[in-house]
Each structure stands twice: as structure tokens, then as C-alpha cells.
Curated annotation (Swiss-Prot):
It is found in: Cytoplasm. This is Inorganic pyrophosphatase. Keywords: Cytoplasm, Hydrolase, Magnesium, Metal-binding. It comes from the Bacteria. Homohexamer. Belongs to the PPase family.
Amino acid sequence: MGLETVPAGKALPDDIYVVIEIPANSDPIKYEVDKESGALFVDRFMATAMFYPANYGYVNNTLSLDGDPVDVLVPTPYPLQPGSVIRCRPVGVLKMTDEAGSDAKVVAVPHSKLTKEYDHIKDVNDLPALLKAQIQHFFESYKALEAGKWVKVDGWEGVDAARQEILDSFERAKK
């Protein structure tokens, strides 16, 4: 059994499973799980000397407008191992556009059964302002030194937009 068998969640869109590809604060290497084999591949070495400000992964059985599963950032008290799966609750979404088109990054917090530390966070605006700024800065800058690549941050949207992003992507994947 591989990661491809992990369901999207227990109760979409509020209770999701996120497959972690990149731990928080890790070296500037972009990893991606190959959806067919379940193997973790090095996608590229990032040209900028930056690290992901939160764990980064995706929701299985979803298809975003960019052609990939829904991207999710998960702040946790400790970095998570690549290939691990964490039960989460979405709280918001960072809407962006890059050289390939529309690109959204859902932000989700660990489910209450894993830790009570994030229970007070109901919406992206409940996250620490510094963490939101770090996430936004990271995505505004992480492709800056890569030829032909760019990112424009369109802004933050709340929990309802994150839920809709997950539901729309789940439905898109079923087609």
C-alpha cells in the first residue's frame, strides 16, 4: 500500500488528510510525491536560500486548477517527516498566480485529536501575523532567481474559501 491509497479525508472539506512532501524549516529542496509510485522525488533545488515556513503537502484525490492536487501548508509544533500523513482542518487559503496560471495554497491546522494547540484558530486571520507574513513572503520570493518563473500573490481568503477550494478540487478529480 502506498500514499496513493490515502483518502482525501474523513469528512470533506472540514476534516482532511494532508500528505507531507516538505517539512517545515527544511533545506531549500522542492520534493514531490510521485502520484503513481508513491515515491518521494527531488523536484528541484531551489535557487533562493529560503525554507518553507510550514510543512507543505497535498490532499489526495483532488485536482486544482494548476493540474496538481490541492497544495496545503500545515503549521505544527515540530517539522513532519516527508511521506507522513496528518489529519487537518482548513482555516484559509493564499490565492496566487504563477507562470503556469492560478495557484492556491490552503492553510490547515492539525486536527484537535492530534493537539489542542490550534483549537483557537478558526480562520486564517487567527494565525499569528508573523506566520502569515512569512508564508506570503516565501511564496512571493521563492522563485525569484529561477529564469522564466514568477509568482504574484493575489491575497488571503478565509476558511469558507479554503473549504470551497477543497470541494471544487475533489469534484474536479472525479471527472
